[in-house]
């Protein structure tokens, strides 16, 4: 199990600034996580997700590239 920021197919974090309050928690649950929240109103952070779920990594960041 791991935690971290959800990323999309483009390698960018899931934004949540304009999303409903439960958006991140729902997205994390869809990926078998046990919860999550919108960190600083910018990106979804999830807890206890399976290792196969892609999460943001500064060393492997490819957002916008």
UniProtKB/Swiss-Prot annotation:
Q: Where in the cell is it found?
A: Secreted
SUPFAM superfamilies cross-referenced by the UniProt entry: Scorpion toxin-like (SSF57095)
Q: Which Pfam families match?
A: Toxin_3
Q: Name one GO biological process term.
A: envenomation resulting in negative regulation of voltage-gated sodium channel activity in another organism
Query: In the UniProt record, which is one GO cellular component term?
Result: extracellular region
Disulphide bridges, residue numbers: 12-63, 16-38, 24-44, 28-46
Q: What Gene Ontology molecular-function terms does this entry list?
A: sodium channel inhibitor activity; toxin activity
Which N-terminal stretch is annotated as signal sequence? none
Q: Which UniProt keywords apply?
A: Disulfide bond, Ion channel impairing toxin, Neurotoxin, Secreted, Toxin, Voltage-gated sodium channel impairing toxin
Query: What does this gene product do?
Result: Beta toxins bind voltage-independently at site-4 of sodium channels (Nav) and shift the voltage of activation toward more negative potentials thereby affecting sodium channel activation and promoting spontaneous and repetitive firing. This toxin acts on human Nav1.4/SCN4A and Nav1.6/SCN8A voltage-gated sodium channels.
Q: What is stated as this protein's family in its record?
A: Belongs to the long (4 C-C) scorpion toxin superfamily. Sodium channel inhibitor family.
Write out the domain note.
Answer: Has the structural arrangement of an alpha-helix connected to antiparallel beta-sheets by disulfide bonds (CS-alpha/beta).
Give the protein's recorded name: Beta-mammal toxin Tma1
Question: Can you name the source organism?
Answer: Tityus macrochirus
């Amino acid at each position: 199990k791991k935690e971290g920021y959800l990323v999309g197919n483009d390698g960018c974090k899931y934004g949540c600034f304009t999303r409903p309050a439960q958006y991140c928690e729902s997205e994390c649950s869809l990926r078998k996580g046990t919860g999550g929240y919108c960190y600083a109103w910018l990106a979804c952070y999830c807890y206890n997700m399976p290792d196969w779920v892609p999460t943001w990594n500064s060393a492997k960041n490819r957002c916008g590239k």
